[in-house]
Amino acid sequence: MDTLSHALWGRGLFGYKGKPYWSLFFGVVPDLFSFGIYFLINIFNKSNSEVRVSIETELPNYVYSLYDITHSLVIALIFVLVVYFFINNKLAFAMLAWPFHIVLDFPFHTAEFFPTPILWPLYDVRFDGVSWSTPLVWFSNIGGIIFLYLYRFIKNKKSN
């Protein structure tokens, strides 16, 4: 799934209990802390004038390691539970955008392009899903986001 969609799903599903911006942030955390770090390093690396990620791009090993860590339901749920029990339950609710990101990713990433290791480090299970750029998946995603925000808008209007 694209990063913007993850942000919108995170905000729409988990941003209505007082932490809307945190839900946006946690919706993109898995991509931000894997590909985002790579992107920033390349911006500041003077030898590269362009930053493009494709199937043909040779990525450094740390990107794959960070992807495994940030795209694991095990890791995400540990963080959410620690925050829930020891810090702030409203923040923990917004943080649920992170595991939801993972749940959205694993059926829509192919084996060729970052299959999602949802049970890492316990099990290195990865699924060969349908590409999120497939028209049926892409338009269903957009339709789902529109429906979610219309629902939130109507529900908010009725309560005010």
Language-model features: locations:
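N-terminal membrane-targeting hydrophobic helices
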Residues: M1-N160
